[in-house]
Amino acid sequence: MGYDINXXLAQMXKGGVIMXXXXXXQAVI
């Protein structure tokens, strides 16, 4: 179970940054 959470957290952080940049525009960066 710990592995699943770690993998999800790692993907969320990477995917979250890309999604936020596209959804919020370049203002985030």
UniProtKB/Swiss-Prot annotation:
Catalysed transformations (reactions): aldehydo-D-ribose 5-phosphate + D-glyceraldehyde 3-phosphate + L-glutamine = pyridoxal 5'-phosphate + L-glutamate + phosphate + 3 H2O + H(+)
Keywords in alphabetical order: Lyase, Pyridoxal phosphate, Schiff base
Any GO molecular function: pyridoxal 5'-phosphate synthase (glutamine hydrolysing) activity
PROSITE patterns per UniProt: PDXS_SNZ_2
GO BP terms: pyridoxal phosphate biosynthetic process
Top-rank taxon: Bacteria
InterPro entries: PdxS/SNZ
Keyword Lyase appears in the UniProt entry: yes
Enzyme Commission number, as recorded: 4.3.3.6
Pathway: Cofactor biosynthesis; pyridoxal 5'-phosphate biosynthesis
Family from the record: Belongs to the PdxS/SNZ family.
Misc. remarks from the entry: On the 2D-gel the determined pI of this unknown protein is 5.1, its MW is 32.7 kDa.
Function: Catalyzes the formation of pyridoxal 5'-phosphate from ribose 5-phosphate (RBP), glyceraldehyde 3-phosphate (G3P) and ammonia. The ammonia is provided by the PdxT subunit. Can also use ribulose 5-phosphate and dihydroxyacetone phosphate as substrates, resulting from enzyme-catalyzed isomerization of RBP and G3P, respectively.
Subunit structure and binding partners: In the presence of PdxT, forms a dodecamer of heterodimers.
Name of protein: Pyridoxal 5'-phosphate synthase subunit PdxS
UniProt organism field: Clostridium pasteurianum
